[in-house]
Structure formats: structure tokens, C-alpha cells
Amino acid sequence: MNRIWLRAIILTASSALLAGCQFGGLNSLPLPGTAGHGEGAYSVTVEMADVATLPQNSPVMVDDVTVGSVAGIVAVQRPDGSFYAAVKLDLDKNVLLPANAVAKVSQTSLLGSLHVELAPPTDRPPTGRLVDGSRITEANTDRFPTTEEVFSALGVVVNKGNVGALEEIIDETHQAVAGRQAQFVNLVPRLAELTAGLNRQVHDIIDALDGLNRVSAILARDKDNLGRALDTLPDAVRVLNQNRDHIVDAFAALKRLTMVTSHVLAETKVDFGEDLKDLYSIVKALNDDRKDFVTSLQLLLTFPFPNFGIKQAVRGDYLNVFTTFDLTLRRIGETFFTTAYFDPNMAHMDEILNPPDFLIGELANLSGQAADPFKIPPGTASGQ
């Protein structure tokens, strides 16, 4: 009875021990002589979306030189449920690569053997350095097409790529050339001439393409406005269609106006030319007296008074006027009853009135005197 219990215990322990062990074949064990296992070797992990048929112990190469080996491949699940392969690489101690190095699964031979290729990045500057425990993210990994994928794509092209049409193209080309060798011989120099002409105008063609590019950029920036314009275009066309009779009438009226204008110009062109000739003398006179004409324009704002008198009378925003009214009977009688123009014995109005000095010069108190006011000595006119 004791032997039975002892056998059961031994069998249970053996089963538990064997259940905790796993053996994946000889390739799951580190093979002797592979790189990346010597003194100073270190390990890095590469995240790859697709490793194809990459096995463990595959070589790791830098510039076609083996510097390590694949130590293991583990499938890791992302939070969204997708998977990626975490490839552990053992590298020799003399491998110096930046931390942002790129890793690719490459084809070693046409027989299907694969290896992992490590290299510095080419699209950005290298940073940092790979050390033990570093990780190369999935963004820095890639895979070259395998031999099977290349032959599969080639089979698709051959079978379903319409390669058979190539025979028809060759046959049609032969029929076009057969019997017309002379024309095609002359065609070659013409093509050479055309090519030379295009070569001479290559800068103009480039400028035209640049201009087209700028126009395209402008249209791209205003695509919203163009879209709105195209949306409103049907309504505009509809309005034009509704008013097409009025538009036709307007153009017909414009035609009649053009005919009348043409007739008037034809009948009056001689007179119009003579008028222009006669206008030359007027324009010439204005040009000759342009300085005096411009100076005379100053009098328009103060007519009939000269501007220098206005400047003396007007100070600021106010006009100072001093007026003396003589309403005596003697002055009224002399003014209204003794100034008949046709009576030579009566004094005239210009002999009685004395305008201000600042308006017409020193003429005050010069009644009846035949003298030039500008030649009278100062003080004489005012009675001094």
C-alpha cells in the first residue's frame, strides 16, 4: 500500500516538472559559434509589425557584416487587441549604433533565409546610442519583400497584367512601319529637330510650369470662394436666361447707337478737325499767359476786391468794418439831386464818393483832380 502511494507521488511530481518545461527544438537554443554571445555582448529589443518567416538564431548584420543574432521572438498584444513581434537581438560589444537606428528584415538568399539588418537613420540625424536594454520602436522598423512575394507579384503581372496586349502593340507597330521605311527615316531627323527646339525652350517651359504652379496655388487658396462662385453660377445663368430678350434688345440698341455715332462722326469730322485747329490759338494764348492767368485766379475768391485788401480788413474769423453815414440834408441833396450825369455843371458821383484807401489806392479827397493816385506823394490824398 505504501509503495502505491509512493509511486503516485513520484508520478505527480514528474508530471508537474515536465509541464513547467518547454522544448521548441534545437533552433530554440543558442547555437555555438553565433555572434552576440561573447564577453561584453548586449541585448536590444526590436518592435516589428511583420517578421515574415524569421527564425531564432538568424544573423543580425550591419553593412553586410554579421554582428549578432536573433535571441528570441515573442508576440505582444497591444491594448487595442492587435499584435506585434518583440524581437530580441544579441549584439557584439563593438556594435556602435545610434538610439534611433532602423531595423529591417531582409532576404539573405533566394532560398528564403532571412536576417535582421541594422543601420543608422538616413532621413534624420542620429541621436543617442544603443545600449543593453534599448528598444527600437515599430516606427523605425520595416521589411523587404520576400522571394515568394516577388514571384507572386510577377505571376499576377504575367497572368492578369494584360501582357498579351504587348504582342498586339508590336504587330500594329510593324504594320505601321512596313513599307514606310522612307517616311520613318525622315521622321527621325524631324523628331531630333523637335527635341532640340524643346531643349532650347526648356527654360520657358519651366517658367510656364512655375506660373501654372502659382496659379494652382492661388486657386487652391481660394477654393472656398471658387466653390461658392460655382454654387451661385446656376442662379446667375438662370437670371441671364430669363432676361435674354432684354439683353438682346440692349445689344440691338447699342448697335443702333453705334451706327448713329458713326454717321455723326463721319458727317462732322471735317468741322471737328477745323474746331480743333481753331482751338489751338486759344490754348496757345492760355499757355503764353499761364503765369498771369494763375495769378488772376486769386481774385476769384475776393472779387470785386483785391485779396491784399481783404487780408488787411479780415483778421482771423471776423471782418472789421468802419462805416460813416452822413444823413444831413446837404449831403443827401448833393448826392441825389446834384449829380445828374448829363448836367455838366453838377458834380458827378465819382467826384463826391471817396472809396477806402485799402481798396483802390489813395483816391480819398481827390474830387475833381485829374491826377494819377499812384504818383501822388504820400499824405496828400488824406489831406495831411
Swiss-Prot record:
Pfam families, per the entry: MlaD
Claim: 4Fe-4S is one of the keywords in the record: no
Subcellular location(s) per record: Cell membrane
Cleaved signal peptide residues: 1-20
Predominant location category: membrane
Keywords: Cell membrane, Lipoprotein, Membrane, Palmitate, Signal, Virulence
Modification after translation, per record: Lipidated upon expression in E.coli.
Domain of life: Bacteria
GO cellular component: peptidoglycan-based cell wall; plasma membrane
N-palmitoyl cysteine lipid attachment residues: C21
Sample GO molecular function, one term: phospholipid transfer activity
Topology of this chain in the membrane: Lipid-anchor
Biological process according to GO: intermembrane phospholipid transfer; symbiont entry into host
Alphabetized InterPro entries for the sequence: Mce, Mce/MlaD, MlaD_Phospholipid_Transporter
Lipid sites, type S-diacylglycerol cysteine: C21
Function field: Stimulates the host (mouse) immune response; lipidated protein produced in E.coli stimulates T-cell proliferation in mice previously sensitized with LprN. Spleenocytes from these mice produce increased amounts of TNF-alpha and IFN-gamma, as well as somewhat increased nitric oxide levels, upon subsequent challenge with LprN. Previously sensitized mice infected with M.tuberculosis have an exacerbated disease response, suggesting this lipoprotein may down-regulate the host's immune response.
Protein name: Lipoprotein LprN
Annotated organism of origin: Mycobacterium tuberculosis (strain ATCC 25618 / H37Rv)
